[in-house]
A protein has these predicted regions:
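Single conserved hydrophobic/aromatic residue that forms the stacking wall/gate
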Residues: 1-12
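Extended, charge-rich helix/loop segments that form flexible
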Residues: 15-114
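Active-site glycine- and acidic-residue-rich loops that bind
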Residues: 65, 106-121, 151-155, 173, ...
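Loop-centered beta-sheet repeat module
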Residues: 96-147, 152
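Gly/Pro-rich active-site loop or hairpin
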Residues: 115, 147-161, 181-222
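Acidic (Asp/Glu)-rich catalytic clusters
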Residues: 126-133, 163-171, 190-200
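Hydrophobic faces of well-ordered beta-strands that scaffold small-molecule active sites
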Residues: 136-138, 172-176, 201-205
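An acidic- and aromatic-residue-enriched active-site/binding cleft used to recognize and process polar
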Residues: 141-143, 177-179, 208
């Protein structure tokens, strides 16, 4: 189970090369901001970025090519949404408009409403999980901070503790994604692993390296 906000798993380079011949995912915050502000044109988006980031977006606008813009659209919308949800496909006309309609589905939904929806769902399915011995595991938001104005509800220690306590059942557990959690400088991944070990039902062992400016890159393959 992913939180609803994980609908926006946003990366700008899905094939960032490493010296050993492998590749991984790279998040460039300024290019993501450019997509949000100049391509998507989301209302109020400028409030989500610092003055320094807005200035960098303005500079990028002077040099970015149409091919690079198309690549951002393809990476952030077509490839990512096609993989995660299957609701956008290669060859779809005007994927930006399709994506805007998907975002509009969350209009008026705040953090508290999304939390309550999660609590309601988990409470409803726990009796069935108990009956059949099924463990549910919630995947952290990826990345673990707000994007595109959407509420994020599984980003840190407090969030994880909240959903585990909201439906305090051993079948309600965590997917411990080291990559997602370590992308947030606010998270101590080792301590989180220790604290929530008993309620961790599935593990994604891949780390990320956080860099200045909000960028991060997933490590090479284990």
């Amino acid at each position: 189970l992913s939180s609803a906000a994980s609908d926006v798993y946003k990366r700008q380079d899905l094939q960032h090369p490493w010296a050993d011949g492998t590749s991984s995912l790279y998040f460039d915050r300024v290019r993501f901001a450019y997509f949000d502000l100049r391509i998507l044109g989301r209302e109020g988006a400028e409030k989500d970025y610092s003055a320094e980031e807005l200035a960098k977006v303005a500079e990028l606008d002077k040099t970015i090519t149409e091919a690079e813009k198309d690549d951002l659209i393809d990476t952030i919308i077509v490839k990512t949404q096609g993989f995660v949800n299957g609701n956008i496909k290669e060859g779809d006309k005007n994927p930006v408009n399709i994506f805007k309609k998907l975002l509009a589905l969350y209009k008026g939904i705040d953090r508290d409403m999304l939390r309550e929806n999660m609590r309601y769902f988990l409470a409803a399915v726990m009796p069935v999980c108990e009956e059949y011995g099924v463990n549910m595991c919630v995947h952290p938001d990826d990345p673990p901070f707000q994007v595109l104005g959407l509420p994020r509800i599984v980003t840190n220690e407090a969030d994880i503790a909240w959903f585990l306590n909201a439906v305090d059942n051993p079948h309600n557990g965590l997917t411990f994604c080291a990559g997602s959690l370590s992308a947030g400088e606010h998270n101590d991944t080792r301590e989180l692993a220790k604290k929530f070990a008993k309620r961790t039902h599935f593990v994604h062992l891949r780390s990320t390296a956080a860099m200045p400016g909000g960028n991060f890159i997933e490590s090479s393959h284990l």
